[in-house]
């Protein structure tokens, strides 16, 4: 059992839990994720790690309720327990694998959208702790929907909040902020984009035009987190990948976002899953119990 030591509603319908999970906290790196289960019969829910404290043995997760399980999960309080808290899973961010001295020579840009700010934060924090300060753009619909602002400002080289309605920071989409920074003479060596798939798609279209290599995190399409259900199958160039086992990070300029978004929508219905099985044959390997493909 894994105890929730802190439970907080960051903003409307976005929640933060800090959970005691010493083994995970000891081993995890930025970019990885965990799978949680509330009880023995509960669904497996993949969530990207937002922060970790190795000394305290805790992991911080941030989530937005979108279905029955996460809606039930938001009712948990400090002192409650998760039955399972499995991780760390997936591959760590490419940045943490690079030589620190080489990283210090690079100008790095992060672009996050909505709850995507949560997986951006541990990467920016890790870089800051190693003497590398990155520029960070975080977008949301309104000021009230921005999360982790104080934390992000503390570890960013420059922090640029954006709101669609212009209520705070830069007025407009994150892509217009990227353009503005480049027009001011910023020459970025790499961009890391994490957020809704439609946001990542348009960031990648822009950065490809600007000649900025871009990494995206495809965690939004994960369902069971083991590769068994096939929900996170996607084309990266000419190759078929699974976000939960091969990623979650990929070259954003090679990801087929239109296909990934279409598959994400189809997996929400039994008819859609049946069509995918007909089209792709062995996409679903059975046994995950999450996507309905065993029915």
Residue spans of the language-model regions?
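Ferredoxin-reductase
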Residues: 1-80
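Iron-sulfur (Fe-S) cluster-binding modules
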Residues: 1-30, 39-41, 96-107, 129, ...
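Structural signal for conserved beta-strand scaffold positions within catalytic alpha/beta enzyme cores
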Residues: 6, 51, 161-163, 216, ...
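A generic structural signal for residues embedded in beta-strands
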Residues: 36, 84-85, 234
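Short, surface-exposed secondary-structure boundary micro-motifs
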Residues: 39, 87-88, 237
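Short, Lys/Arg- and Gly-enriched loop/turn segments at beta-strand edges
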Residues: 42-51, 89-100, 244
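FNR/FR-type flavoprotein reductase catalytic core
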Residues: 71-223
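Local cysteine-cluster metal-coordination motifs and their immediate loop/turn environment
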Residues: 119, 197-198, 220-249, 283-295
């Amino acid at each position: 059992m894994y105890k929730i030591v802190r439970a907080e509603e960051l903003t409307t319908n976005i929640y933060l839990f800090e959970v005691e999970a010493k083994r995970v906290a000891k081993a995890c790196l930025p970019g990885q994720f965990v799978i949680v289960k509330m009880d023995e019969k509960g669904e497996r829910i993949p969530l990207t790690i937002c922060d970790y404290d190795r000394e305290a043995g805790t992991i911080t997760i941030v989530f937005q309720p979108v279905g029955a399980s996460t809606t039930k999960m938001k009712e948990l309080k400090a002192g409650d327990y998760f039955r399972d808290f499995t991780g760390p899973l997936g591959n760590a961010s490419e940045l943490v694998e690079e030589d620190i001295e080489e990283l210090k020579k690079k100008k790095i840009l992060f672009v996050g959208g909505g709850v995507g700010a949560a997986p951006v934060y541990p990467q920016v924090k890790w870089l800051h702790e190693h003497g590398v300060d990155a520029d960070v753009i975080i977008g949301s619909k309104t000021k009230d929907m921005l999360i982790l602002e104080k934390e992000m400002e503390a570890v960013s080289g420059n922090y640029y909040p954006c709101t669609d309605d212009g209520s705070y920071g830069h007025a407009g989409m994150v892509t217009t902020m990227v353009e503005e920074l480049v027009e001011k003479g910023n020459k970025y060596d790499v961009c890391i984009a994490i957020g809704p798939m439609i946001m990542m798609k348009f960031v990648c279209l822009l950065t490809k035009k600007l000649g900025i290599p871009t990494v995206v995190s495809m965690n939004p399409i994960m369902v069971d987190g083991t590769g068994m259900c096939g929900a996170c199958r996607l084309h990266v160039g000419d190759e078929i990948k699974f976000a939960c086992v091969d990623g979650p990070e990929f070259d954003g300029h090679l990801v087929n976002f239109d296909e990934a978004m279409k598959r994400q929508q189809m997996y929400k219905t039994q008819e859609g899953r049946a069509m995918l099985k007909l089209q792709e044959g062995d996409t679903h390997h059975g046994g995950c119990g999450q996507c309905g493909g065993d029915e």
